[in-house]
Design a protein with these regions (language model features):
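Intrinsically disordered, low-complexity segments
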Residues: 2, 76, 146-149, 301, ...
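C-terminal motif of bacterial Sec signal peptides marking the signal peptidase cleavage site
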Residues: 26-28
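A sequence-level/structural motif corresponding to short, flexible coil/turn segments enriched
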Residues: 159-536
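Bacterial N-terminal signal peptides that target proteins for export
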Residues: 2-15
Length: 536
């Protein structure tokens, strides 16, 4: 019997297929097969890198509600992207802080764009005022293939927000007067809604630190609407607040004194009969105040204790808009008039007038000017008893030529103390504008604020009524002009100078000034410029 050995060679199928691929031979065919080589996606193996950042590193004057845009080189895994949305704990993989990560800004849920390469962030509220804000990206951030950042990223110093402040209620509020003490603290007074419905009004006083931090705000409790207010700081550290209130068939003067901690020391309301034609209020160096008066008087003087000293009758046709007292207690008055003044005939409509009277009510001199249409002085400022500036509005030249009471131009004119005109400047826009406030600097330069419905010289129009601020030298040369605002209406009503020449502007806005929080109706704004017109 023969025995045959049965050798069985077992070759795995994959090995045979691999051999087939290596030889490149197909049975019955002499051609070589081309086999594609699959390469890994190197993009998914790359570490995520931050390639662009908005606002940029070291950016300044960033709006307080600005969005943050982070752009990366590769798509990111959304599951690794988190922010602290519920509290101020620095807990997410993306963190924003203004105090070295002791706590972080609450953020809205993030938004992804550009195939997950771009992250859009917005704050739930607003950023802190005039602070550097750093951004931290932790190493837990990954791309779609699970590859992390090489290391944690922290911007330094980050971006810096604006100084601008905004406060208000759901009703209509307005800043009217502002003052700065020797330490740089800012005091702000004006009108606010006294109840939720907004139908009751009251006077308020607020104190800000130089950094913009709101130290306190007090509602005076007079429960009256006010049309003008002034602030004066005593050497003893007390703040004098004076306001003029006009309501139907009734007007009143409000006197109050506050300590620097916000405590009310003294207050008094002096009720007057009738309603005066016009508004305005000023305080002389002795603390006495002057206001428009009801018939038969035009101006009333009230002592610092609230006693009525005298009433002065000037002309029955005066509508007073502004008053200012010099260091000798002489009084300047401006506004509009519809009849002759001191035998000076008006040109038509209502003309602008400027009067100077002594502290005893005796008239020194008067000036009138205007067109066939309506115009008015709205603001006054005195410089060292040597010059007086009058600001207001006049009809645009085209409107005056056609006899059409349409658009208006803002103006400012300088007189010397004897009533001689020195120079005039007219702000020209396509639509209406008015000057509303003026202030001299100690160096004799003049600041003029107002509002415009269009773009002034080389300026951008944000929308509706924008605020503007201009600075002139003593000869009337325009040094700079700035236009600012929101898409809604703004009007500046008060100016003050800081200890280093800063310029503080207050008034009202119906939008978000530099990204600040909007409460509704009209809000109070407070913004700061340096002496060269750079907004802070």
């Amino acid at each position: 019997m023969s025995h045959f050995l049965d050798f069985k060679i077992r070759i795995p199928h994959l090995a045979i297929f691999a051999l087939f691929l290596l030889t490149g031979l197909l049975p019955g065919c002499g051609e070589t097969a081309l086999v594609p080589v699959i390469k890994p996606d190197n993009a998914l193996l790359k570490n995520p890198e931050l390639i662009a950042l908005e606002p940029s590193e070291n950016a300044t004057k960033v709006k307080r509600n600005a969005k943050i845009v982070l752009s990366f080189n590769v798509p990111l895994d959304s599951l690794t992207l988190t922010v602290n949305a519920e509290d101020t704990q620095c807990s997410g993989t993306i963190q924003i802080t203004s105090n070295n990560f002791l706590n972080c800004v609450r953020m809205n849920p993030l938004e992804l764009k550009d195939n997950n390469k771009k992250i859009i962030l917005t704050p739930k509220g607003i950023y802190a005022t005039q602070k550097f804000h750093q951004i931290r990206l932790t190493a837990e951030i990954k791309n779609l293939n699970g590859v992390s950042l090489k290391k944690e990223i922290t911007t330094n110093p980050g971006f810096k927000t604006t100084w601008s402040q905004q406060i208000g209620t759901p009703g209509d509020d307005s800043g009217m007067a502002v003052s700065v003490d020797p330490k740089g603290n800012i005091y702000l007074a004006g009108l606010t809604s006294a109840n939720e419905s907004g139908d009751k009004k009251d006077l308020f006083l607020a104190k800000y630190a130089p950094s913009g931090f709101l130290n306190w705000i007090q509602q005076a409790g007079f429960e009256r609407s006010v049309t003008a207010a002034v602030l004066h700081q005593k050497k003893a550290g007390l703040i004098n607040l004076r306001a003029y209130s006009q309501e139907k068939e009734s007007s009143a003067v409000i006197l109050a004194v506050y300590a620097v901690d916000g405590k009310k020391i003294f207050s008094k309301t002096i009720k007057l009969n009738g309603t005066a034609p016009g508004n305005g209020l000023t305080m002389d160096k002795d603390g006495h105040i002057y206001i428009p008066a009801a018939t038969p008087f035009n101006v009333m003087k009230i002592s610092k204790t609230g006693k009525i000293i005298l009433g002065t009758e000037l002309s029955p046709g005066l509508r007073i808009r502004a008053l200012a007292a010099d260091t000798e207690n002489a009084l300047y008055i401006t506004g509009s008039i519809k009849q002759s003044l001191d035998r000076k005939k008006i040109k038509g409509g209502s003309d602008i007038f400027l009067l100077k009277i002594s502290q005893h009510g005796l008239k020194r001199w008067s000036r009138t000017f205007g067109t066939a249409l309506n115009e008015s002085g709205t603001a006054l400022a005195i410089h060292s008893d040597q010059a007086v500036a009058v600001a207001g509005y006049i009809p645009q030249a085209e409107s005056a030529a056609e006899g059409d009471a349409g658009a208006q131009d803002a103006f400012v004119v300088k007189y010397n103390s004897a009533g001689k005109q020195q120079w005039t400047y007219i702000f020209k826009g396509k639509n209406s504008e008015q000057s509303t406030v003026v202030l001299w600097t100690p160096e004799g330069e003049l600041l003029v604020g107002g509002y415009t419905e269009s773009s002034l010289k080389e300026q951008h129009h944000a929308g509706k009524e924008d605020a503007f601020l201009a600075k002139f030298d003593s000869a009337g040369k325009l040094l700079w002009l700035r236009q600012f605002g929101t898409e809604e209406n703004e009007r500046p009503l008060g100016l003050a100078l800081g200890r280093e020449g800063q310029i503080f502007v207050t008034g009202f806005t119906e939008g978000q000034m530099d990204g600040a929080k909007f409460s509704g109706g009209r809000d109070i704004f407070l913004v700061q410029f340096d002496k060269d017109g750079v907004k802070q």
